[in-house]
């Protein structure tokens, strides 16, 4: 079934007219857009169309506001407040002349001093020594290594160098004590090492060995052996052995003496004191 299109000629004209009204309302605030359009057409001398039907109405149009007045001329300004001389134009001229020349009074001198002080504050002082460009690696190394660093420690002996020196001195003393210990052990193998307590600061005492007599008479085994010999001699004096018994007794005595000698050698070997190679000192701050 055929239907007429929606956008016919009348609908298109209505859309065009509504667009004109909306554009006029966005630009201007007068109530009659048609009269405004006719006025513009007469001013701009555009081709005019026949006037629309109906009475003509001349409505007032809005105009732009006037610009503000120009500022006053520079010659009409007030005189310089710090000018000397009479008031008015003559005083202003005299004040300008005095200001351009020498200072007129103490106030002007103070003002000039303040300006000079401000200028000196604006100046950047030059660095001493004057910096120079580094052109090679050798120059960079020489400049960085020649710089001296001040010691930031207020208490003497608390810096890293002083603490390292104290540790090194302590280790040297410990090594010296170990050396003397081994030397004494090599000289007297049968001695017993004794260590002294750490001395006070300023006094140095070395470890010493107490010599022990190597004679078998002072040892307990030597004493028992001497007692046995004395008992055997008393028994020999009491008895009067026969030749056969004397030979057997001699053989027995020889075997017994050989056994006693072997036992004495074993006892001597066993009585040897083993000297430890470990240090026998107590580390202390020197």
UniProtKB/Swiss-Prot annotation:
UniProt key word GTP-binding: no
Regions of compositional bias (Low complexity) in chain numbering: 242-265
Origin species: Torque teno virus (isolate Human/Japan/TRM1/1999)
Keyword Transit peptide: no
Spans annotated as Disordered: 67-108, 184-286
Keywords: Phosphoprotein
The protein, known as: Probable protein VP2
PTM per Swiss-Prot/TrEMBL: Phosphorylated at C-terminal serines.
Compositional bias (Basic residues): 222-241
Domain of life: Viruses
Pfam families, A to Z: DUF755 (PF05501), TT_ORF2-like (PF02957)
